[in-house]
Amino acid sequence: MPDSKTARVRIVRMPGGADDDSVVVEEPLEIRVGDKPVSVTLRTPGDDFDLAAGFLFTESIVARRDDIESIRHWSSPNVVRVALAGGARVDLQRLQRHFYSTSSCGVCGKASIDALRVNAEPLDDDVRVDTGLLLSLPDALRAKQTAFETTGAIHGAAAFTRDGALLRVREDVGRHNAVDKVIGSLLLERASADILVVSGRTSFEIVQKCVVARIPILAAVGAPSSLAIELAHEFRLTLLGFVRDGRCNVYAGEQRLAP
């Protein structure tokens, strides 16, 4: 199957003249639970089943892998239908958000901090990671970002074990979508991770997704927002920013870092 993440377009370089260039593809994806649409997000095609599973899990629509019976495309490549397992208990009305979200806004009125407090516990404090190892992980992510190398316009997320073993890498025009793809893949394969690395900044929704997925360490190449830091402290998540060039800032959870 050809790569659906990028497309070729005609441009004019100044100076230089007409040329062809690669750009990242951005298309809508409708996620349905049964016959009920629950979200439309702008994403980069690819790993759509992972995205749907990760979205439903991190928004607490489903609580576990066994809640999902099947995922398949429905009527078009831009519609995904999730069938729930018999006995799965979900509350679609609990999701207080706008129906549409854009590639730059994952939270956009979705689950609030109060809802997260009801559905999640603070993270366990049983993971220790070598700081030097953590500082090397953004380079490991970047080395696997094939679409970024081509376009320079796509976010990446990667899951690792505490020993630095790479588990998953996903790319998407939306940072929150890349994270959902990683978490959804882990969920569908009943796997777990200790560290999530993201290529850009860290906002509230990225911390929220880590808390729900029980990933205790979040490292980002960019900076976190004030709300991301507040949430990290409340749920005892280790939050690192500006992880590059052999250094970083630790905003919360420094107890998990070994010298």
Describe the function of each predicted region.
Residues R175-P259:
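Feature captures the catalytic cores and cofactor-binding loops of soluble hydro-lyases/lyases
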Residues M1-A157, T161-R162, L166-R168, V173:
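Intrinsically disordered, low-complexity regions enriched in acidic/Ser/Thr/Pro/Gln residues
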